[in-house]
Amino acid sequence: MEAKTFNPPKRILLGPGPSNVHPRVLEAMARPTIGHLDPAFVGLMEEIKFLLRYTFKTENEITFPVSGPGSVGMETCLVNLVEPGMKVAVCINGVFGGRMKDIVERCGAKAIVVEAGWGSAIDPQRLEDVLKSDPDIKLTAFIHAETSTGAQSNIKELAEISHKHNCLAIADTVTSLGGIPVKVDEWNLDAVYSGSQKCLSCPPGLSPVTFNEKALHAIKNRKTKVQSWFMDLNLITSYWGSSSRRSYHHTAPINALYGLHEALLLLKEEGLENSWKRHKLNSEKLITGLKQLGLNTFVKEEERLPELTTVKIPDGVDDLKVRNFLLEKHNIEIGAGLGSLAGKIWRIGLIGYSSNEENISNCLTALKEALK
């Protein structure tokens, strides 16, 4: 086998993530690497924390990007707050709620499942009923934007119910942050994580997280050691915390953090509300075009994500053949269904930098050709 310099094809990324990356972000990532404890880099870290607080709409001091993809953010929140023997209410309406359950059980806790059909939002009343029936539950976990189905749940209400029953609440905002409203402080979310590769329009590899004081108090007063050295918040905050003197914890992905900083600047320049409006408007245009092609959406309108549209594959249409046609003939990537939805839906993402009118037009043209 011969290896040579890799030159990737130019793709239009219209799947569930990653999204296309803004040229300014790519340019930022190509700048010279400096040390992860360099005073200039420490200054950049502070700016990233400031910009993430803006994006999460929070004043939480402990707000920073974990080194790793969104799944590492998920594990960071769970392994710090879950202890062996605990009961945790896990809301599942797709693949990623199921992943939360798996992590909870790996931590030696018992997952109490609050389930909804794939493609539906979590019913807050079902969570209420579960928490009423078992006062030993101390933590809830739920997905804001379920990437496997394109459905969004009302996490403000889920958090309110959680606190009513003296539970801390963990929220997954991997696909929602930057694309639809996420208001950490106003909604009283205790621990939240996201991902860099969705509406923040960065390459994969960083997972922004934020923890409020209630969550930090629970972590500091654990009966057992956090079951991960790398993700132990008691350790990592010596590097990402507020101290003027930073301690070595791990070597941060320096150039990736350059990119995240630039992406967050771009989002602030656009304005969060404008970003939310752009994603909503472009979603409406895409769905209008899909209907004209005779295609139907999978999620009902009031629960549908604007940044990720799931489309029912018509009877007799070969899922893989259509996706391959789009990729090979038009350089467009759309996503397949996962789990029980494999072969039944396509996932079309207008996410972050990929959410624009030109991409909508190109996607609809390509689908029209593929379905002839």
Question: Where are the regions a protein language model picked out?
Answer:
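Conserved beta-loop-alpha segment that forms the PLP phosphate-binding cup at the N-terminus of a helix
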Residues: E61-A89, N93, G97-K101
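Active-site phosphate-binding strand-loop segment of PLP-dependent enzymes
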Residues: I122-G178, A191, C199
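Conserved active-site segment immediately N-terminal to the catalytic lysine
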Residues: D185-Q197
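Active-site C-terminal subdomain of aminotransferase-like
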Residues: N20-V21, Q197-T288
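Conserved PLP-binding catalytic core of the aspartate aminotransferase-like
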Residues: N296-K329
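A glycine-/small-polar-enriched, mobile loop at the entrance of the PLP active site in fold-type I
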Residues: K10-S67, S71
